[in-house]
Amino acid sequence: MRVLSFLCLLLVSYASAKQQFSELQYRNAFTNWMQAHQRTYSSEEFNARYQIFKSNMDYVHQWNSKGGETVLGLNVFADITNQEYRTTYLGTPFDGSALIGTEEEKIFSTPAPTVDWRAQGAVTPIKNQGQCGGCWSFSTTGSTEGAHFIASGTKKDLVSLSEQNLIDCSKSYGNNGCEGGLMTLAFEYIINNKGIDTESSYPYTAEDGKECKFKTSNIGAQIVSYQNVTSGSEASLQSASNNAPVSVAIDASNESFQLYESGIYYEPACSPTQLDHGVLVVGYGSGSSSSSGSSSGKSSSSSSTGGKTSSSSSSGKASSSSSGKASSSSSSGKTSSAASSTSGSQSGSQSGSQSGQSTGSQSGQTSASGQASASGSGSGSGSGSGSGSGSGAVEASSGNYWIVKNSWGTSWGMDGYIFMSKDRNNNCGIATMASFPTASSN
């Protein structure tokens, strides 16, 4: 009843908003989106979700029509409000303001102009954490997988590691399973435990409260130490990611992040200190935000149906994090395919900055970025804008970006990846809480 009452209130709010497209355009776009994302609703919920979708479609159009480096789209989160997204998929923000400027041990390396650890074979395929606030565990396994691969030298031994091992077994270190945790605490567990099991031997279930099933015989990697990056220093983060993939915490709370599709992500409203999501930096690059390139496998045709994707629960329970652990505790990408943490899409498929999506000409149809184009009208440029939130002055783009691996499956972003702005005052706090492990070569 509480959910239905909430949705009824949303109906009143969205029904009164000014519509940017015809009802036929909205309806066809929603129908196509529901088919693409295998979404079904009860009769009571359908109209509320439809109104939310319309509002998100308007937001995407407004943002993209301004032209810019960030392209939004009607992705897997297009039928939920930003408040639902925050409550259901992100943790309580961790305040990292006290960390800014904290000096850490210098990382002595001369960074290459560009780095992409996917191309080196050091990154496993995109995973999906499902209905569990365990992004901290995915960020941890990602950096540990990369460190192990690099330490293996000529063996080039890339092993997918078990997030469930961390969720079930690291609570005594201060982590809280599906309710939140920190990557650094997970590193401490792996060090003291003398290893972490492989994913194949300890598969992901997206469930909490299970008995620890770690077995020494199933260890896939070991680490001997970890190091924090100087907080707030993107130069230090670049030096670190020049050597290996790096675990980071970010502010992922804005609607622009929720509906991100491609391009270099820059959000003036992003906080550099209020961090609610753990992800993995797998490299960095530079390029014009208007250059064309692969759109991460998303069709630019007018149908917007794309490939079949996993259904996301729009009414899942929020994953609250325990105090001090929310920097990487967000419950992101909670799709119904939670029991499988690894998607079929291989990493390393993204290249270059993404361009806006082309629109079709069919009446009532939408482009891959969700722009209605009926009779050639209304789609806008589709090239994105860096200031959709309308807050703050927009800093000039450096054209530089971090290559970031998320854990929300391949139906979000560029096949599960996002290019985040680099060298723009630590946008979204990407360098505020960064750390990486050193693996044993054994």
Swiss-Prot record:
Domain of life: Eukaryota
UniProt-recorded name of the protein: Cysteine proteinase 4
Post-translational changes noted in the entry: Glycosylated; contains GlcNAc-alpha-1-P-Ser residues and fucose.
Compositionally skewed regions (Gly residues) per UniProt: 377-391
Low complexity biased stretches: 287-376
UniProt cross-references to Gene3D superfamilies, sorted A to Z: Cysteine proteinases, Cysteine proteinases. Chain C
Keyword Signal recorded: yes
Residue numbers annotated as active site: 135, 277, 406
Glycosylation sites: 228, 254
GO molecular function, one term: cysteine-type endopeptidase activity
Subcellular location per the Swiss-Prot or TrEMBL entry: Lysosome
Cysteines joined through disulfide linkages: 132-178, 169-212, 270-428
GO biological process: immune response; positive regulation of apoptotic signaling pathway; proteolysis involved in protein catabolic process
PROSITE patterns with a match to the protein in the record: THIOL_PROTEASE_ASN, THIOL_PROTEASE_CYS, THIOL_PROTEASE_HIS
Propeptide: 18-111
Keyword list, A-Z: Disulfide bond, Glycoprotein, Hydrolase, Lysosome, Protease, Repeat, Signal, Thiol protease, Zymogen
Signal sequence range: 1-17
EC number from the UniProt entry: 3.4.22.-
Region of interest called Disordered, as start-end residue ranges on this chain: 286-396
CDD domains linked: Peptidase_C1A (cd02248)
GO cellular component: extracellular space; lysosome
Family, similarity comment: Belongs to the peptidase C1 family.
Membrane-spanning segments: none
